[in-house]
A protein has these predicted regions:
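Walker A/P-loop
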Residues: 67-89
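Conserved helicase motor
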Residues: 108, 128-142, 283-286, 301-317
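Inter-Walker segment of RecA-like/P-loop motor cores
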Residues: 123-169
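Conserved Walker A/P-loop ATP-binding site and its immediately adjacent core
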Residues: 90, 97-121, 134, 227, ...
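N-terminal accessory nucleic-acid engagement/regulatory domains that precede
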Residues: 1-42
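Conserved strand-helix element at the start of the C-terminal RecA-like helicase core
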Residues: 100-111, 271-296, 300-303
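Interdomain hinge/linker at the junction between the two RecA-like core domains of SF2 helicases
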Residues: 213, 217, 221-274
Length: 318
């Protein structure tokens, strides 16, 4: 009702000249995905990384036929959960005539990466990226996206935890416009372990409300599932989408941690210089800047939240 009021006012003020487009149907998007992954599905070599990813992908496609409800996708890092979760969501949406897929992600850097992957598979006009770093500006070409960000009238939405829960808890009418497009959707919480602890109970209560009264399915998608069972209703059951979880984690285990204790700054620099490929994460922006200045040269990059988002994108592209 709130969104209809806004849309009617907009239509009147613009003499019925509406610039909004809702994107393609879910069946069409599923067909796009199936064309993209068609050759992957032939790989059944479980001794290869791609074969393991295909096993998870196939399981998600099959699981899409399940009834609405709560799902977990516990996939180790490198297991292809971005495409696998999209495959489940599209199959599930087509099966139940659901209208939207909403990705809820804690970090804008992950949002930007995932949104780009989805655009490449599903087409630019079908994916809405909505967070504080997106500025559609006054571009006529991007006007439909700017308008869609007001009420999430696109088939696939990629957004933040803050944007999603504010749309449900805020008392402002402009935020309420999205609620009817959250209903009858598949909502995927990527990196679900990052849900803020101090707000966990109301967030879980809202998820249950969406499942019980808004024809919505919830997917908690992560490599490390948080212990949420005690917060959900005790009668609430979930379906795990990843096959043979323990086996997958053993296969994808490619990191060994070694505690070096406290080391001097100069020692760290010398250690980094001996490595062909290395990622160094430090506690402060200042320290990261100092390291970069000491190491700067071909193949050395500096990433920090003190940079503008466009600058970070440029560095990541390099």
């Amino acid at each position: 009702l709130v969104d209809a009021d806004f849309l009617e006012t907009e239509s009147f003020m613009k003499n019925n000249h509406v610039e909004r487009t809702s994107g393609e149907e879910m069946a069409s998007l599923l067909a796009r995905l199936e064309r993209h992954i068609g050759s992957w599905l032939e790989n059944d070599d479980l001794n290869s990384i791609n074969g393991r990813r295909t096993e998870i992908l196939k399981a998600c496609l099959i699981a899409g036929e399940n009834d609405r409800g709560l799902f977990h996708l516990t996939v180790p890092t490198g297991g292809g959960k971005t495409i696998a979760s999209l495959a489940f969501a599209l199959k599930h949406a087509v099966r139940h005539q659901m209208e939207h897929i909403i990705y809820v992600i804690p970090y804008t850097s992950i949002i930007e990466q995932n949104a780009q992957v989805f655009r490449e598979i599903l087409g630019q006009d079908n994916v809405l990226e909505n967070h504080c770093n997106v500025d559609y500006g006054d571009s006529e070409e991007l006007k439909p996206m700017q308008l869609a960000s007001e009420n999430w009238d696109k088939p696939v939405i990629v957004t933040t935890n803050v944007q999603f829960f504010e749309s449900l808890f805020a008392s402002r009418s402009s935020k309420c416009r999205k609620i009817h497009n959250i209903a009858n959707s598949v909502v995927i919480f990527d990196e679900a372990q990052m849900l803020p602890l101090e707000y966990l109970k109301p967030c879980i209560a809202m998820m249950e409300n969406l499942m019980d009264f808004y024809r919505t399915s919830i997917v908690l998608c992560t490599a490390t599932q948080p212990a949420l069972d005690s917060i959900f209703d005790q009668h609430r059951r979930y379906i795990e989408l990843c096959p043979n979880i323990n086996e997958q984690f053993k296969f994808f285990k490619r990191v060994i941690y070694e505690n070096l204790g406290i080391i001097e700054f100069d020692t760290l620099i010398e250690r980094l210089k001996t490595e062909k490929r290395a990622l160094c994460i430090v506690n402060t922006k200042k320290c990261a800047q100092q390291l970069y200045e000491q190491l700067s040269g071909d193949g050395v990059y500096h990433l920090s939240t003190s940079m503008y988002p466009k600058h970070r994108k440029k560095i990541l592209a390099q």
